[in-house]
């Protein structure tokens, strides 16, 4: 099998053995030694969970605020009215509205990374499932994007958070920062992701989980 030049350089990193298992701190230290590319790469971790995603009571989904952030600028849209809309604006949401935001989305507008809605606004948002679902933008209580506490949700989204969801193979892929972050920042982000996954373990899941 032919290997890319980048792969060969990575294998040649001092102290790295592709056949060996490493602890989290050691793995992060090695990751930062790998030759990079011309942009600030995202560090991502993958977990194989001991769940059966075919069973509705074994879905794993959630979100967690990352203490060191994500290193990305996030555009937040909020569907709310009244006091909740004012709270969202004060918290720094990029787009805030009610029927007007919903109508914009219906017309194809998706110039945002996270959509937050109050519970009473979901009657307007639910019909947008076909447009929002494929991009993972549909608000969901499990990820904290359907909430009355819109101010907190906006601030958390702006500060940096990671969403996770097990796929059909029970795998979860979660970004936990940029390679430009120092090792302690990446480790702190990694640790809170693991804690969140443990808390999200379905009660019906048996045996080894992570």
Regions found by a protein language model. Give the residues of each.
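Generic N-terminal amphipathic, Lys/Arg-enriched alpha-helix
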Residues: 1-17
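Translation machinery proteins
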Residues: 24-86, 107, 113
């Amino acid at each position: 099998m032919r290997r890319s030049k980048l792969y060969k350089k990575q294998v040649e990193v001092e102290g790295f053995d592709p056949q060996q298992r490493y602890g989290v701190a050691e793995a992060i230290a090695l990751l930062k030694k790998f030759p990079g590319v011309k942009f600030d790469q995202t560090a991502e971790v993958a977990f194989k969970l001991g769940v059966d995603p075919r069973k509705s009571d074994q879905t794993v989904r959630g979100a967690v605020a990352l203490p060191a952030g994500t290193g990305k600028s996030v555009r937040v849209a909020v569907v709310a009215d009244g006091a909740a809309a004012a709270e969202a604006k004060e918290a720094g949401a990029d787009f805030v509205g009610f029927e007007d935001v919903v109508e914009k989305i219906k017309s194809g507008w998706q110039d945002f990374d996270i959509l937050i809605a109050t519970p009473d606004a979901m009657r307007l948002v639910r019909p947008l499932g076909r447009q929002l679902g494929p991009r993972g933008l549909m608000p969901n209580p499990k990820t904290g994007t359907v909430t009355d506490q819109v101010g907190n949700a906006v601030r958390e989204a702006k500060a940096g958070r990671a969403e996770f969801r097990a796929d059909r193979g029970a795998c979860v892929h979660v970004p936990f920062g940029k390679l430009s972050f120092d090792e302690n920042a990446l480790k702190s982000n990694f640790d809170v992701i693991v804690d969140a996954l443990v808390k999200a373990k379905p009660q019906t899941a048996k045996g080894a989980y992570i």
